[in-house]
């Protein structure tokens, strides 16, 4: 399961700056659920291929004596729920009493904790971080979050336990090294699409992990019970009756599924127990662990900012998506028309997802959900050959030529599959990384229509070959050398 990293520390030590650096955002609003918990932000991050969920816990302004009360509630739960804690301190301000109080609490927890000294830019990091070793949390990692210095190395150290062990290097004989060298030279000299590797993976042999997510009391557990045909999940007419994600295996139409019923994302005003306040982490982890996400929306409450924030996290994770508008029964035709107009207005950016209008309580429309779930999963795991992708790319280029970049036409060479769930198309060419966003969207939509992909986002990646002449100066011919010599002589006489 994707690890969770919590950023803790005093106010103004740079937690939000590091959060923005890791999530590649400016305003720290990635997967932010307004009003859920004060000053808490959630984001999905990827650094050097390492994926994780990062949580900004807000400032903890505690003292050595009163840290337990200051860290109660949300901040305390954030530390308990996280897999890794980054305890951030201010290298310029030095060691403060609040830092000592927070460190004392962290030492009492069996949690992987890394001490991070921020704001070390422009100063000697060794001198600035010396006092922090007295906190008893081991090595001090010096970074400058505003400039990104030391951040990549920090994440590599933090994520080391979650990385696959590297395979030991195998020593080659002189004959094997010679053969490998010439094979590499031959491969570099050819500019041809790679052959499609043989893949014995059959996605139909694996159960489909279906995460049922949404705000509290939209009917997620009722829908789960309706699908299973039994009261497997405790249901009450009040938000927050499902506290932890529940994994339930099932079979439908000879197809194996694993249903993931998640704790809902709720507003701060409806929270009555502290244990309910951090269930959003369970939801985000369930999304990452799933193949298809079923987002349940309450037709009578409409689409809230929390729904859109959750939808944004689903899209960022690349998971397949099916939308269920629940509590459709009993609504007038006029009210239904208003809901459909609202869906068209606010969900236009996810036009690839199927939308179903259901009643989990009475079962109407529930049976059709699995057709869309199966379709979305099949589309996200469908294997497509290099020749077909290249042909689609060429047709897109013929219908609408790439724009000029610095006076030269962008050249698209070939395309191949780069991954699945979500489908990734890798396009090779010259200057492809300089393509405008509008043309990239055009290519993405063209591939979606041509491949008839529904229920899953599709991603386009661009790669361009190295220019063998980059950074090299052309040698002058003898004639050019003589002309240069005469010119330099003329310039000297002019002085």
Swiss-Prot record:
Swiss-Prot/TrEMBL keywords: GTP-binding, Nucleotide-binding, Repeat, Ribosome biogenesis
Protein family according to the UniProt entry: Belongs to the TRAFAC class TrmE-Era-EngA-EngB-Septin-like GTPase superfamily. EngA (Der) GTPase family.
Binding site for GTP 1: 9-16, 56-60, 118-121
Function: GTPase that plays an essential role in the late steps of ribosome biogenesis.
Positions annotated to bind GTP 2: 214-221, 261-265, 326-329
Stretches assigned to the KH-like domain: 382-466
Subunit structure: Associates with the 50S ribosomal subunit.
GO biological-process terms attached to the record: ribosome biogenesis
Protein name in UniProt: GTPase Der
Classification via PROSITE patterns: G_ENGA
NCBIfam families documented for this protein: GTPase_EngA, small_GTP
InterPro entries associated with the record: G_ENGA, GTP-bd, GTPase_Der, KH_dom-like, KH_dom-like_a/b, P-loop_NTPase, Small_GTP-bd
Species whose genome carries this gene: Yersinia pseudotuberculosis serotype IB (strain PB1/+)
HAMAP family: GTPase_Der
Domain EngA-type G per the UniProt entry, residue ranges: 3-166, 208-381
MF terms (GO), sorted A to Z: GTP binding; ribosome binding
Keyword flag Transport: no
């Amino acid at each position: 399961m994707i690890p969770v990293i919590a950023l803790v520390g005093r106010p103004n030590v740079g937690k939000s700056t590091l959060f923005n650096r890791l999530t590649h955002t400016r305003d720290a609003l990635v997967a932010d659920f307004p009003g859920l918990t004060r000053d808490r932000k959630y984001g999905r991050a990827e650094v050097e291929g390492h994926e994780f969920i990062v949580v900004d816990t807000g400032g903890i302004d505690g003292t050595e004596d009163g840290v337990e009360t200051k860290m109660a509630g949300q901040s305390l739960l954030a530390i308990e729920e996280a897999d890794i804690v980054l305890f951030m301190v201010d290298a310029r301000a030095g060691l403060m009493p609040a830092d000592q109080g927070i460190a004392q609490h962290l030492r009492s927890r069996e949690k992987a904790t890394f001490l991070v000294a921020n704001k070390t830019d422009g100063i000697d990091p060794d001198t600035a971080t010396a006092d922090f070793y007295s906190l008893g949390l081991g090595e001090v990692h010096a970074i400058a979050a505003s400039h990104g210095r030391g951040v990549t190395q920090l994440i590599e150290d933090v994520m080391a336990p979650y990385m696959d062990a590297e395979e030991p290097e195998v020593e080659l004989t002189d004959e094997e090294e010679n053969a490998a060298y010439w094979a590499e030279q031959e491969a570099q000299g050819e500019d041809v699409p790679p052959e499609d590797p043989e893949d014995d993976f059959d996605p139909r042999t694996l159960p489909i992990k279906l995460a049922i997510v949404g705000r509290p009391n939209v009917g997620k557990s009722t829908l789960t019970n309706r699908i299973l045909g039994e009261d497997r999940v405790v249901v009450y007419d009040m938000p927050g009756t499902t506290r932890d994600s529940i994994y339930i295996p099932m079979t439908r139409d000879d197809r194996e599924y694993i249903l993931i019923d998640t704790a809902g994302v709720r507003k701060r005003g409806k929270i009555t127990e502290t244990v309910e306040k951090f269930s959003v982490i369970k939801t985000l982890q369930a999304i990452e662990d799933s193949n298809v996400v079923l987002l349940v929306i309450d037709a009578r409450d409409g689409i809230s900012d929390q729904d859109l924030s959750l939808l944004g996290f689903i899209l960022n994770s690349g998971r397949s998506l099916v939308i269920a508008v629940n509590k459709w029964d009993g609504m007038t035709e006029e009210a239904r028309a208003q809901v459909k107009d609202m869906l068209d207005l606010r969900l236009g950016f996810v036009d690839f997802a199927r939308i179903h209008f259901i009643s989990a309580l009475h079962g109407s429309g529930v049976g059709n959900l699995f057709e869309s779930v199966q379709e979305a999963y099949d589309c996200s795991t469908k294997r497509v050959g290099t020749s077909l992708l290249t042909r689609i790319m060429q047709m897109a280029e013929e219908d609408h030529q790439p724009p000029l970049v610095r006076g030269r036409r962008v050249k698209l060479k070939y395309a191949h599959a780069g991954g699945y769930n979500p489908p990734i198309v890798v396009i090779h060419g010259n200057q492809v990384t300089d393509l405008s966003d509008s043309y990239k969207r055009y290519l993405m939509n063209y591939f979606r229509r041509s491949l008839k992909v529904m229920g899953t986002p599709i991603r386009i990646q661009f790669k361009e070959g190295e220019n063998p002449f980059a950074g090299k100066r052309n040698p002058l011919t003898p004639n050019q050398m003589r002309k240069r010599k005469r010119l330099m002589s003329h310039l000297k006489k002019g002085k």
